[in-house]
C-alpha cells in the first residue's frame, strides 16, 4: 500500500458579512487541504473583503511556514502545525477539525475524492475540490485498459456511490471540479451561449427562418443552454488556454517549471487524452476507446495516446495555438450537461445532440521545455520542481471556451485574459494562473454558504451568474466575441471533425 503525503494547509474559522451574503455563517469553519501552487488560495482568502477570520489552523506534512510567513505574522489568529493524511487516518484527522455545518476545501492531489466526499456527506460537512482524485492513480490494474485511467471512470465510481441505498440523495452541498478549468470554464460556456445567441439575433437575424428564430428567442429567455447550443449549431467546444508568463530565472537542467501544481499537471498529462464526443463526429481517430454502453451517460471517449502527446489546433485572442488534449473534468461535465436526448426515449444510444468538448492547452515556454525533458527521462519526474511566482516578469494566462461550427457564427471565444501585472495589482503574491483558480474557489465557498444543502454538484449544475458576479472583477480583461478562425478555406470548416483539428506530434 502506497501512502501519499498531502498538505493540510489552512484551517479557517470565518464570518461572511450578513448584509453581503444574507446568511449566518458565524459558527462555520473551513479546512483547506493542500499547500502547492493551487493552495496559495489562503493568501487570497486572507484579504478577501467578504471574509473575516477568527481562527485559522494551518497544518502540513512538511514545514511550509516560510512560504506563508507574512500571513502567519500578519494574522494573529493563524496557527501552523504539521500533519500527514493517508487513507488510514483521513477520517481521524477530519473528525479532529470539522463538524456539522463546516466546509472542507480539498486542494491536494491523489487524495481520494470518494473517501472525502463520503465522510463529508455522513458528517453534514460541505465539500469543494478542483479535481476528482484517487489514492493510487497508476496502479497495476490500469495498465491493460486506458479507460480505467480516465476521469469518466472516476465519475462512474462517484455515481455508483450515490446509487447505493445508504446514500441520502441530497445532503450537504459538494461542488466538484471547481477551479478555473475545470470550474469557471463551465460558467464561461453558459455566458458564451447567451452572448452568442444575442449577437446572432441582433446581427444575423435576417438569415434565420422565423420558426428557428422563435425557438432561439425562447431558449434564450429561459436560459435553456443545451437548446441554445443545439439551435446555434455548436459542434465543438475547446477549452483553449495559452500561458505566456515569463520568468527571469530560466529553467535549469533536471528541473520542472510550471505556473501551477506540477504533480497534478504531470499526472493528468501522462493519462490518456480524453474528451466529450459529439454527435457530429464521423471520423474516428487512431486508438480511440469507447466506454461500455448503458454504463453511465457514455458521453466521453479516450485515446491510447496520453494527453501531452496529443495535439490540436485551436485559438485564443492572441492568435492560433497548438494545444495538448489533456484530460480535464470539464470535458465530462460540459458535454454531459449540453446533451439532448430524444424526448420519447431515454436510452443511452438515442442522443439527439452533443458537442465534442476537450482541453487545448499551451503552457509556458518553461513548462514546454520541462515536458520535453520529462519525456526524455522516460516520463520520470525531474528531481527539482519550481512553481513560477515572484520571478515572473511578464506575460498572461488566456483561458476561455471556443465554441466552433455554429450555423451563423463559426467561432466564438469567451474567457479571461489576465496578465501578471493585472494579477499583482489585484492580489499581491499571485501569478495569473493561481489567481484565476483562487477566485473560483472563493466563489464556490460563497455558493456553499448560500446553498448548503444541494448535494453533489458539478460546476454546470450551479448558478453561473452567482459565480461570475464574484469572479469577473478578478479575471483581468474579459473577452466574449466572435473569432475569425479558422480561415474560410481551412479543412477544419468542412465538417468540424476532431481529426481535422489534430496535429502530428
Where are these regions (language model features)?
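Rossmann-fold cofactor-recognition segment
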Residues: 76-87
